[in-house]
Amino acid sequence: MNNFSIISEYKPAGDQPKAIDEIIAGLSSKKRSQMLLGITGSGKTFTMANIIERTNRPTLIMAHNKTLAAQIYSEMKSLFPKNAVEYFVSYYDYYQPEAYIARTDTFIEKDSSINEQIDLMRHAATRSLLERRDVIVVSSVSCIYGLGSPDLYYQMVVNLEPGQSYLRDQLLNDLINLQYERNDIGFERGCFRVKGDNIDIFPSHYSDKAWRLSFFGNELEYIHEFDPLTGEKLAKLDKAIVFGNSHFVMPQETVNNAISGIEEELQKRLEFLKSQDKPLETQRLNQRTQYDLEMLTETGSCKGVENYSRFFTGRNAGEPPPTLFEYLPEDALLFVDESHVSVPQIRAMYNGDRARKKVLVEHGFRLPSALDNRPLKFEEWDKFRPQTVFVSATPGPFELEETGGTVVELIIRPTGLLDPECIIKPATNQVEDLISEIQTTIAQGFRVLVTTLTKKMAEDLTAYLQELKYKTSYLHSNVHTLERIEILRDLRQGTIDVLVGINLLREGLDIPECGLVAILDADKEGFLRSEVSLIQTIGRAARNSAGRVILYADKMTKSIDKAVSETLRRRQIQQEYNEKHGIIPKTINRAIHALAEFEKIDSKLDKKQAHTLFDNPAKLKTHIDKLKKEMLKAASNLEFEQAVKLRDQLKTLEEAALELS
């Protein structure tokens, strides 16, 4: 069995050793919930990694969005190169759920675009959880949505071992039952092909490796791992396990039982609709469901098959659907990152999903069982979650209640950096004073972040500062992902000195060059000026030893008082620690590589073209598809050098698209 092993030049420092010991002690004493209060720059991810290494338990890390999940995944991957670090988020690039608007009698069909790279990574995650214990899965909150039953998923695997006999037709049929497609021409992920005594399989969890099964009669002689593009043999395998090409694969017997259950529910529902004198809904439901039943009978699947998932999993009405949590072993560990955002998200998901599906059921578009194709209710998630460590700089009420208000603090940064000095100034002449502060900060060689309450004010302030010849930019929700990254890079490099935003200057904005954070209208109580928002925004100045925060306010609100008091408390603890240990705070010197993924793209893609691709996901997908065809064409023409070059370019584009999605 592989143990977790961190590969890093760093060792736990500051508050990290104490926090690691406290959390591990809590886990050993069977505490179900613990709270790790980690301030900006305290090394929360590194602390989590050390807890995982010491406890040696399979781990799920939940984040509140794909971007944060990708960031944690990247960090964990670099810390645990010898272990299985997996990424599990929604595989939709675009998703429009089916819906019915009764007011206008408008039915909206489900429309979606699946990201093949993310689908591959989801398969790799579930496979790792079923095959090994040294697994870290980094997930968004979408992991609470229904997934195929792990029992059926594992029951359907095909085990292959050299020296064993296999009936060829039966093996091919087994692959088809796993929803693999036979394709002797276009060999890609989720396909298999037959050539003489060889069967090639492109597993669902690989992007650049395939397996070649070499037979002598019915006996499997060899299993080789090979490069599907060049045909080069990479390794000889002692065994291979083929998992389903979908998480919803199931035996034919299960499909037959499900069809019977669907037919029974359909008859009951039709009788009910007739008794309610709803002929249109009756006819609509019968027609749609009968079509789905025909498809299930003929192919074992249908469009929207997930709406019948309760029948396939054998669950009763109202019971929770199988999710990623059922793939976790009993002794798994759960970290909920930025829990003050993640926990409310989990709480909200069920109600929104049910409201939409309830309308579909009432108007005859779906059977009532479709309501059971859903995310977990908050209470169900709370019941299923294993031992949990909530992680946040600003814990929410649920986490504090679960832990009895007890928190494990990460306040001392390994770098010795202090929480920024907080200054409160009148809001009456805030813009005039801000200009003076901007001049001072720029003269020191630092950058300025300014947060406003409204989009209009942000736009007007940006325009005004630009008129005064300050290098200013405005960060808002309409800025494309790539453009956002470029703006932040320009800010760090000094191309921009001042960045103005609204709610985009909180979690995850890492600017060591920032010497001043200015919060305008700080005394306007509300979501953007709550205690949590203020603490998170103040944290943006904590990467710089000279970092300051100015809160412009004409009155002292409860939120300002609490946020400033908490910042001062932390600052005093940090100062005392530094004095005791002779530490001089130094600004983090972090390399500017925000556009690394973008700049790695082959030189054939000029900057203007790449801008266009990343600004328009549809164009990017079209370009990726075009590259795939060119690569396969080059390979079929035996132009392997060109094919490999195209493959590398394609891989870079797909990775960049994944991180920028």
Curated annotation (Swiss-Prot):
Keyword Nucleotide-binding: yes
Motif residue range(s): Beta-hairpin: 91-114
GO CC annotation: cytoplasm; excinuclease repair complex
InterPro entries according to UniProt: Helicase/UvrB_N, Helicase_ATP-bd, Helicase_C-like, P-loop_NTPase, UVR_dom, UVR_dom_sf, UvrB, UvrB_inter
Binding site for ATP: 38-45
Assigned keywords, A-Z: ATP-binding, Cytoplasm, DNA damage, DNA excision, DNA repair, Excision nuclease, Helicase, Hydrolase, Nucleotide-binding, SOS response
Location within or outside the cell: Cytoplasm
Domain Helicase C-terminal positions: 430-592
SMART domains: DEXDc, HELICc
GO molecular function, one term: DNA binding
Domain UVR span(s) in chain numbering: 621-656
Main subcellular localisation: cytoplasm
GO process annotations (BP): nucleotide-excision repair; SOS response
Location of the Helicase ATP-binding domain: 25-182
Quaternary structure (record): Forms a heterotetramer with UvrA during the search for lesions. Interacts with UvrC in an incision complex.
HAMAP family linked: UvrB (MF_00204)
Domain notes: The beta-hairpin motif is involved in DNA binding.
Protein family per UniProt: Belongs to the UvrB family.
Function: The UvrABC repair system catalyzes the recognition and processing of DNA lesions. A damage recognition complex composed of 2 UvrA and 2 UvrB subunits scans DNA for abnormalities. Upon binding of the UvrA(2)B(2) complex to a putative damaged site, the DNA wraps around one UvrB monomer. DNA wrap is dependent on ATP binding by UvrB and probably causes local melting of the DNA helix, facilitating insertion of UvrB beta-hairpin between the DNA strands. Then UvrB probes one DNA strand for the presence of a lesion.
NCBIfam families: PRK05298.1, uvrb
Name of this chain's protein: UvrABC system protein B
Organism: Rickettsia rickettsii (strain Sheila Smith)
GN (gene name): uvrB
